[in-house]
Amino acid sequence: PIGSNYNKTVQLCGEFYRPPLPFPACRADDIECLRRGLRTFFVLMDSGHVGMKPIDPFLVNSVAVALPDEQMSILLRRANVTGVRWTKLVDRRFNGGKSGTTFSSDLHVTGEINVNMANRVEPFVAFLTMDIDQVESNITYPWHATKGIDNEDYILIGPERIAIRNFRTPTFFLQPNTEDTIPIDNFLLSKPSILDHMSNEITAALMHSVMDNFRLFASSVIHYYSLL
């Protein structure tokens, strides 16, 4: 299977050798080829290639939203996120020593939502299921090439900047159907910006983890396999 033999580097007759990865040979402007390469990258990531961490499912410990004017706060706890492995490459840009990538994702989120109000001792609590459709992640990062001990060129990735854009307001439903769910449901329906904020925070955390994996991948695999 992919990932079982590709993590191994051996030395033959004084030369370092790593088995080739199943990547297509892509030109920088061949977006369809790059999309196929991205799919392979996610397969390798799921398999733990070169120490990468699988991120589907992905756990976000908490997302907090403070609303001082309403004297309330919202906390989404232990959000479980799935669907990132089907992320699509929308655009790829090069600008000197910087690269830009735009992803589109459809994500499914579940977690416990707590709504705390100043006039209540106990929070409203419910289980939230949320679908984030067509969320776009615009990622830019600096990079430069370096020589490895095998005299091959590898890529070092600098800190990324991530901007998230929602094309659709996330949809949701709450469980179970109790007295607590009614005020939470009414509040989220009246303030869709809260859903957008939670969606952006979750997607940004997820994409930072994708970039952490790509950073490890790019520094371990010779440069012409770099596709992000």
Predicted regions and their residues:
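Tubular lipid-binding modules of the TULIP superfamily
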Residues: 2-130, 142-150, 154-156, 228
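Short linear sequence motifs
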Residues: 10, 51, 134, 207-210
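Envelope-exposed proteins and targeting segments
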Residues: 105, 135-137
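Short, low-complexity, Pro/Ser/Thr/Gly-rich segments in the mature regions of secreted, periplasmic
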Residues: 213-228
